[in-house]
Amino acid sequence: MVIMSASWSSHAFQPVLERIADEIERTPGRGRPADYIPALAACDPRRFGMAVAELDGTVYGVGDWRQPFSTQSITKVFTLALDLAREGDALWEHVGREPSGNPFNSLVQLEYESGIPRNPFINAGALVVTDRLQTQTGDAAGSLLEFLRAESGNPRLTFDQDVAASEAAHGDRNAALGHFMASYGNIDNSVPVLLDQYFRQCSIEASCADLALATGFLARHGIRADGSRLLTQSQAKQVNAVMLTCGTYDAAGDFAYRVGLPGKSGVGGGIIAVVPGRCTLCVWSPGLDERGNSVAGVAALDRFTTLTGVSVF
């Protein structure tokens, strides 16, 4: 259930966003961009944008809300939804739904758990989901891009080839994860094909406005922007639940405590969040904390739920 203050109405979104942006601008210590992906390391950590999309597609924004950025792990939400729509509960035989507690690219748990990743949002789990979507579609990254273009209404969304190449050049840990899971029979496609799809997936550039709109199906309980159903209401609930418990790497507990919404972050500095039945949000600021989440992004979402009174608790 979403709890909202009695006086809250959608027309107040814009002044709330402007107040948040003003507070963020005056906040020192904004973290550091991801430096292990060279193409992201040059981002200015003080950039900031935030957008809110209502269920009918009305969007409010502030700051750099129309500036495209590297979506990175945010795309894991959409590949999860696309695969879940195709194969349903069979997916959960190959990936779990539990928080990891370890870094997002850790190999440690995989060995203890026989090649079954803890959840779909750590890198190992995301590789499994992309692998299964590749088997289903023949072009996982292309299917994802087509979906994001349709839901955002932006046909110009595209892959950033420089980011994809940068990730491939520094992707030894992901390659190790892929080969390790393949040794347990939990990867169907060749690891090089899988990695190419995964790196392209993570390289998609989109703005806060694009991603807030694209996430709308989760606030509409599985209904896409065109009115067709992607997920059952139960499946949409499942995706939101996994976002809440696993969506911000090993800081999910703190994110739930501070923000109180399902969310998914990426090392490009973006975070999406869902208010079921009401709206979706995306915030971007490239400076990250030690766990890989946007410092200003988490702070902005914290302020949003505090100022508006929205929460899933």
Swiss-Prot record:
Complexes and interactors: Homotetramer.
Protein's name according to its UniProt entry: Glutaminase
EC annotation from Swiss-Prot or TrEMBL: 3.5.1.2
Database matches in Pfam families: Glutaminase (PF04960)
Organism: Streptomyces avermitilis (strain ATCC 31267 / DSM 46492 / JCM 5070 / NBRC 14893 / NCIMB 12804 / NRRL 8165 / MA-4680)
Catalytic activity: L-glutamine + H2O = L-glutamate + NH4(+)
Catalytic class of the enzyme: hydrolase
Cystines in this chain: none
Gene3D superfamilies registered for this protein in UniProt: DD-peptidase/beta-lactamase superfamily
Signal peptide start and end residues: none
Keyword Hydrolase set for record: yes
Binding-site positions, substrate: S73, N123, E167, N174, Y198, Y249, V267
Biological process per Gene Ontology, one example term: glutamate biosynthetic process
Keyword set, alphabetical order: Hydrolase
UniProt entry tagged with the keyword Cell division: no
